[in-house]
């Protein structure tokens, strides 16, 4: 089962630190900010009916695999730094963790949006996360410095980060309308 918690203080020299707090976040709370979570066996998912149904029902027609480590990713330090810049995408970001681990941080909306607090989601082998288009987020590895993920896309893959501020983008406005104003 996925573990998630609010980051109450970010004072660290290393974003790969867990930054644990005692404010855990449930799947229901993740859903309130638009994040969806699924669990599949990463070794047999291609034969899993529930995974295939999810993929087909949502139109995930393209996938590729990314391996993030010092040995596999050219310009590793610069890439990791760019992944950790707060950004959004115009499409959903769908990641299925095949091996390794890391953290997705998404903006908290529990009255803390204005204080720029984060929810940290620990991603491990078998976790499939869907981050909705328009959500501000960032990614970092954990101290193991390795993750391998299947990236799923609808149609032609587009992975263009739009760094904050991007509040006037249609996708951000749609996200705010659907998730943030619905709870205030």
From Swiss-Prot:
GO biological process terms, semicolon-separated: L-methionine salvage from methylthioadenosine; methionine metabolic process
This protein's name: Acireductone dioxygenase
Primary residence: cytoplasm
Residues noted as binding Ni(2+) in the record, renumbered to the chain: 87, 89, 93, 137
Pfam family, one: ARD
Cofactor(s) listed: Fe(2+); Ni(2+)
Positions bound to Fe(2+): 87, 89, 93, 137
The protein's annotated pathway: Amino-acid biosynthesis; L-methionine biosynthesis via salvage pathway; L-methionine from S-methyl-5-thio-alpha-D-ribose 1-phosphate: step 5/6
UniProt-recorded Gene Ontology molecular function terms: acireductone dioxygenase (Ni2+-requiring) activity; acireductone dioxygenase [iron(II)-requiring] activity; iron ion binding; nickel cation binding
Record-linked SUPFAM superfamilies: RmlC-like cupins
Note on how the cofactor is bound: Binds either 1 Fe or Ni cation per monomer. Iron-binding promotes an acireductone dioxygenase reaction producing 2-keto-4-methylthiobutyrate, while nickel-binding promotes an acireductone dioxygenase reaction producing 3-(methylsulfanyl)propanoate.
Subcellular location: Cytoplasm; Nucleus
Keyword set includes Ion transport: no
Keyword Iron annotated: yes
Keyword annotations of the record: Amino-acid biosynthesis, Cytoplasm, Dioxygenase, Iron, Metal-binding, Methionine biosynthesis, Nickel, Nucleus, Oxidoreductase
Matches recorded under InterPro entries: ARD, ARD_euk, RmlC-like_jellyroll, RmlC_Cupin_sf
A cellular component annotation (GO) from this entry: cytoplasm
């Amino acid at each position: 089962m996925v573990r998630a918690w609010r980051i109450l203080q970010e004072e660290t020299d290393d974003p790969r630190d867990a930054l644990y707090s005692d404010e855990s976040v449930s799947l229901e709370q993740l859903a309130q900010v638009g994040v969806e979570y699924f669990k599949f066996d990463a070794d047999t998912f291609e034969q899993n009916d529930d995974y295939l149904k999810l993929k087909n029902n949502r139109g995930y027609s393209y996938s590729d695999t990314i391996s993030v480590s010092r040995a596999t990713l050219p310009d590793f330090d610069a890439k990791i730094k760019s992944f950790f810049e707060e950004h959004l995408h115009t499409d959903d970001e769908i990641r299925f963790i095949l091996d390794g681990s890391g953290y997705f941080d998404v903006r908290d909306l529990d009255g803390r949006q204005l204080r720029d607090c984060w929810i940290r989601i620990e991603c491990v082998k078998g976790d499939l996360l869907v981050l909705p288009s328009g959500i501000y987020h960032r990614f970092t590895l954990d101290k193991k410095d390795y993750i391998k993920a299947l990236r799923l896309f609808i149609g032609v893959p587009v992975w263009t980060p739009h760094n904050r501020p991007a509040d006037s983008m249609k996708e951000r406005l749609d996200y705010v309308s659907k998730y943030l104003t619905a709870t205030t």
